[in-house]
């Protein structure tokens, strides 16, 4: 297989918090110097592409904001294909910005969708409204299934849990491991799955999403998953490396 396109996860692969993984800059610049289409993909919906580019620049890694693709962007792309343009949103600036760009009206009056991302201001009233709207027919869409991040701060999946319990309806999660976000990233690059590799640190999200979308997969051991985890999974990554610094197949 000749790799012509690269999708790469961010946290645990290229960054640890706000510190670059050793070799990350060289890895990314090597891909860009070869002219390969690149998407840096994250499940977290709370930052814009420019926010992420600034985060990388602060860590000494210069990449354009155009290479970033977040679950908020993917959610907006998903919703562009659906009927209805009114949404009740549990989320913050980056998600709301993407929804406005997609032509949505943000409202708490008869919404077509309840869209959940991530926010630190989640409260009883938000949960009540979201559950009420979902129980009464609003379509339940969420950016990503992650329940928590580093330090156990609640993430989108945790915010959805109460709404799901009250309404009896499960959300459609746009982010990994859903193959939908991978196909959306491929569309962004105008790429084909059989010519694309995804690099990730999490077997249950990055590698599973790539596997389900028909991509070659690279697991790096600088983040969530370890070699011991591989034996518990029904699928295997195409390649395994200690970190991006050692990847030699791209």
UniProtKB/Swiss-Prot annotation:
GO molecular function ontology, one term from the record: phosphatase activity
Organism for this UniProt entry: Escherichia coli (strain K12)
Enzyme class name: hydrolase
Single Gene Ontology BP annotation: UMP catabolic process
Cofactor annotation: Mg(2+); Mn(2+); Co(2+); Zn(2+)
Domain of life (superkingdom): Bacteria
Site (Orients D-11 for proton transfer during catalytic turnover): 55
UniProt GO cellular component terms: cytoplasm; cytosol
Protein keywords: Carbohydrate metabolism, Hydrolase, Magnesium, Metal-binding
Biological role: Catalyzes the dephosphorylation of an unusually broad range of substrate including deoxyribo- and ribonucleoside tri-, di-, and monophosphates, as well as polyphosphate and glucose-1-P (Glu1P).
Induction (UniProt): By N-acetylglucosamine.
Binding site for substrate: 11, 42-43, 176, 202-205
Gene transcribed to yield this protein: nagD
Protein name, entry field: Ribonucleotide monophosphatase NagD
Alphabetized InterPro entries for the sequence: HAD-like_sf (IPR036412), HAD-SF_hydro_IIA (IPR006357), HAD_sf (IPR023214)
SUPFAM superfamilies associated with the record: HAD-like
Swiss-Prot/TrEMBL catalytic activity: a ribonucleoside 5'-phosphate + H2O = a ribonucleoside + phosphate
UniProt xrefs under Pfam families: Hydrolase_6, Hydrolase_like
Residues reported to bind Mg(2+): 9, 11, 201
């Amino acid at each position: 297989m000749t790799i012509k396109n690269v999708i790469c996860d961010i946290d645990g692969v290229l960054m640890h918090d706000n510190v670059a993984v050793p070799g990350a800059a060289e890895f990314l610049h090597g891909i860009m110097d070869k002219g390969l289409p690149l998407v840096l993909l994250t499940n977290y919906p709370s930052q814009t592409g420019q926010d992420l580019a600034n985060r990388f620049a602060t860590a000494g890694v210069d990449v354009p904001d155009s290479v970033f693709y977040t679950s908020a962007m993917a959610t907006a792309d998903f919703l562009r294909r659906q009927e209805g343009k009114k949404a009740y949103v549990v989320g913050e600036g980056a998600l709301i910005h993407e929804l406005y760009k997609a032509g949505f009206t943000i409202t708490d009056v008869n919404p077509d969708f309840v869209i959940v991302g991530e926010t630190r201001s989640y409260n009883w009233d938000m949960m009540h409204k979201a559950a009420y709207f979902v129980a009464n027919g609003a379509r339940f869409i969420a950016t990503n299934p992650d329940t928590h991040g580093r330090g156990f701060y609640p993430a989108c999946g945790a915010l959805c849990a109460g709404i799901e319990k009250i309404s009896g309806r499960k959300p459609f999660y746009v982010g990994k491991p859903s193959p939908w976000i991978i196909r959306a990233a491929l569309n962004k690059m105008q790429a084909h799955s059989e010519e694309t590799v995804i690099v990730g640190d999490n077997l249950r999200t990055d590698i599973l999403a790539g596997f389900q979308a028909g991509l070659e997969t690279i697991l790096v051991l600088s983040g969530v998953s370890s070699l011991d985890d591989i034996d518990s999974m029904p699928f295997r990554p195409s390649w395994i490396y200690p970190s991006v610094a050692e990847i030699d197949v791209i």
